Swiss-Prot record:
Main location: cytoplasm
Binding residues annotated for S-adenosyl-L-methionine, in chain numbering: 113, 137-142
Family label: Belongs to the RNA methyltransferase TrmD family.
Native species: Saccharopolyspora erythraea (strain ATCC 11635 / DSM 40517 / JCM 4748 / NBRC 13426 / NCIMB 8594 / NRRL 2338)
Coiled-coil ranges (or none): none
EC code: 2.1.1.228
Protein name: tRNA (guanine-N(1)-)-methyltransferase
Subunit structure, interactors included: Homodimer.
Highest taxon of the lineage: Bacteria
Amino acid sequence: MRIDVITIFPDYLNPLREALLGKAIQRERIAVGVHDLRNWTHDVHRAVDDSPYGGGPGMVMKPDVWGEALDEICGDGTGQVPRLVVPTPAGRPFTQRTAVRWSQEPWLVFACGRYEGIDQRVITDAARRMPVEEVSIGDYVLVGGEVAALTMIEAVVRLLPGVLGNPASAEQDSFSDGLLEGPCYTRPEVWRDQPVPEVLRSGNHAAIARWRRDQSLERTWRRRPELIEALPEGTLDARDREVLDRVRESDHSGDSRSPGSG
């Protein structure tokens, strides 16, 4: 996979050379290019922004600079084209499903905006010759798209063949089956009077798998109940529904005993 990132702060992307991502580059699982947007400016100040039409606070990133950058990096649309990703709090939510889908792409380009954002005409123009997605990593605002790009790149790259030491790690992650991952434990067997759950020390693989599934269901219901509601029909078996009923009943009983009730 090829990944290009366009930014006015190239050093912000240095973490791409570290840890898991750095190893993926060394092993040639991915090729990464980081590009300084200011290289496509033509004035002495290397300006990439201007005041917004219609007034209002902040500045808007200029279309001519972004247009030239995307033309050079992405091409004119006659050959292979990338999927252009624009991190923005106004975008569609980035999810694990998005990461899985993008992991099948040969080429991703991330356009990291700053200030009030990129002139919308840049996105409209790019969409004429390549697939474009405006994506948000959460309901909050950052100072730029670089952190969001790093987050999404790591989520995608770890899914590529040969990147993780154990491929099963990705298969058992939170969201891989629509649920949150349950708790995990390692040595020592007892730490500060807290023992590892007995089932995990039993060697009974079927029982361990069932315990992990139950814990995943319980954690998801209590922390992200909307994920349970969003599961496709037929995802939950009779045991799953039994576990969820028990958790709901337990939570309801706890609420009824809370101070001030009755």
